[in-house]
Amino acid sequence: MSPLLPSFPFAVLALADGSIFHGFSIGAPGETTGEVVFNTALTGYQEIITDPSYCSQIVTLTYPHIGNVGVNAQDAESDRIHAAGLVIKDLPKRVSNFRSEAPLDAYLTEAGVVGIAGIDTRKLTRILRDKGAQSGAIVAGKAGDDYETLGKKALELVKAFPGMAGLDLAKVVTTKKPYEWREGEWDLHGPNGTPAYRTLDTSKPTYKVVAYDFGVKRNILRMLTERGCELTVVPAQTSAAEVLAMQPDGVFLSNGPGDPEPCDYAIAAAKEIIEAGVPTFGICLGHQIMGLAAGAKTLKMKFGHHGANHPVKDLDTGRVAITSQNHGFAVDASTLPANVRVTHVSLFDGSLQGLAWKDKPAICFQGHPEASPGPHDVSYLFDRFMELMNAAKKEGK
């Protein structure tokens, strides 16, 4: 345990099964509730907690040392922290990275996010693995507060959290109005030799793409931009008619938090766009929405997939890729219609990971080909989307 932590106020994590963990507050004072999940990634803690897909979730990071490199503005995947809370084992006393702008605990405090450190994250992860993701609460006290009082309060809060099933959180995290995106990938040799994100040459865009924001990560937009996409990002509830009126070369459906089934507005829009023959690509929640639009069903997973080391098999090539994953729901392969085929499966549990339409230019993937954090083994899926748009252009659609 870091020598810094004992000087911090007490904090308590309580689970719905009655488990209580004692630790120290590393964020804002107060309380938070959410679904407690674990992420096995060794790096990328800032990208993880700023991923909108973690809205209403308390994230447990299994790697013991979190905060080593601090945080900076460039690595955030959205405009703020979306995780409901953070659980870690050890907060280093010092950060060590030339890009660091602030320590993790200061970042959490400034954002008003509750965090806890100093607990046995291995024990917590085993509970979540064996019993499944469950509701939880963190109560971060002030100087003088005791564990018994904080624990009782945390257990009361857990009972009030409704769980993730049935929650439409895409409406919560989506942009309020459309915007243009022109930022590309990170360039170590940017202007004047200074590292910076590249900017799309708008005088020569290759594809006009409309991106639905259900909680989109910035690195997804960057990877699309890098391939010549002139992006218009639209709110989650934008109708298919509005999107089709823009005459896009392709439509992208983003990642996002919560249960896909309540997103009836998005399911209806996706169905109409796919039926119109517009090349369509979905990731994560977007993948689930496309599955529902095809007529399939989704199911709640026991503890989901959260990490950067998940092996996935591409059934078209036979190749295995290591992927970044972050989802608690999945498309039920047994409910797929005849015109949709499975393209990828998880080698951890056999769950469905990718789909392709036999009669339409539409593909989707459950994991995160943009990584951030994680490997880029399946970044070729972005290229497949470009191929679909190229083919549609040649056909004059």
UniProtKB/Swiss-Prot annotation:
One biological process term in Gene Ontology: L-arginine biosynthetic process
Entry-linked SMART domains: CPSase_sm_chain (SM01097)
EC number(s) on file: 6.3.5.5
Region CPSase, annotated ranges: 1-204
SUPFAM superfamilies, per database record: Carbamoyl phosphate synthetase, small subunit N-terminal domain (SSF52021), Class I glutamine amidotransferase-like (SSF52317)
UniProt keyword annotations, A-Z: Amino-acid biosynthesis, Arginine biosynthesis, ATP-binding, Glutamine amidotransferase, Ligase, Nucleotide-binding, Pyrimidine biosynthesis
Record CDD domains: GATase1_CPSase
Keyword Ligase part of the UniProt annotation: yes
Domain Glutamine amidotransferase type-1: 208-395
Catalytic residues identified in the record: 284 (nucleophile), 368, 370
GO MF assignments: ATP binding; carbamoyl-phosphate synthase (glutamine-hydrolyzing) activity; glutaminase activity
Residues that bind L-glutamine: 53, 256, 258, 285, 288, 326, 328-329
Catalyzed reactions per annotation: hydrogencarbonate + L-glutamine + 2 ATP + H2O = carbamoyl phosphate + L-glutamate + 2 ADP + phosphate + 2 H(+)
Top EC class of this enzyme: ligase
Pathway: Amino-acid biosynthesis; L-arginine biosynthesis; carbamoyl phosphate from bicarbonate: step 1/1; Pyrimidine metabolism; UMP biosynthesis via de novo pathway; (S)-dihydroorotate from bicarbonate: step 1/3
Record's function text: Small subunit of the glutamine-dependent carbamoyl phosphate synthetase (CPSase). CPSase catalyzes the formation of carbamoyl phosphate from the ammonia moiety of glutamine, carbonate, and phosphate donated by ATP, constituting the first step of 2 biosynthetic pathways, one leading to arginine and/or urea and the other to pyrimidine nucleotides. The small subunit (glutamine amidotransferase) binds and cleaves glutamine to supply the large subunit with the substrate ammonia.
Record note on quaternary structure: Composed of two chains; the small (or glutamine) chain promotes the hydrolysis of glutamine to ammonia, which is used by the large (or ammonia) chain to synthesize carbamoyl phosphate. Tetramer of heterodimers (alpha,beta)4.
PANTHER family: CARBAMOYL-PHOSPHATE SYNTHASE SMALL CHAIN (PTHR43418:SF7), MULTIFUNCTIONAL TRYPTOPHAN BIOSYNTHESIS PROTEIN-RELATED (PTHR43418)
Protein family: Belongs to the CarA family.
Protein name: Carbamoyl phosphate synthase small chain
